[in-house]
Amino acid sequence: VYLTIDIDLQNYAYEQIKNKEGSIIVMNPNNGDIISFISAPGYDLNLFTKSISTENYNKLINDIRKPLINRAINGQYPPGSTLKPFVGLIALEENIINEKKLINCSGAYSLKNHKRPFKCWKKEGHGPSDLSYSLTQSCDVFFYRVAELTGIDTISENLYKYGFGQKTYLDLYN
């Protein structure tokens, strides 16, 4: 086993997420090495070096922040949010948008020939939003519109280039 974690990056990533719930995974784009891998909140692994007390175990399993879940591997998230950075990148690479392109988020987005509007998590909308703001705010409407402008075939072809729809060959738990 060869560890590829960059300790400085790992420490930096930890500082960014230590009081939050989520995960950070950073890969080297040249060779696929995992250089940072964080799941938060964490817990003291030393609790398990000997027999963990019932009290400590109950604290962990009853913690509403769920520290025993490895969010990077076992977390369950809507795929839309995990695809947003890729949709944005593909639209940039295909010159569909540039980093300053503004798209208005009114809180909902309607597709032609579709009865129900798709809603943004922020009911009142984000207003005019560029790519950077839309990523940091996870603005659904911005990415609905960018995906529509880019087209499903272009998105699908490019996602495949990034490894979507392919086996990872990673030995992950479950």
Where are these regions (language model features)?
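Conserved, well-ordered alpha-helix/loop/beta-strand core segments that scaffold catalytic motifs
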Residues: V1-S23, N30
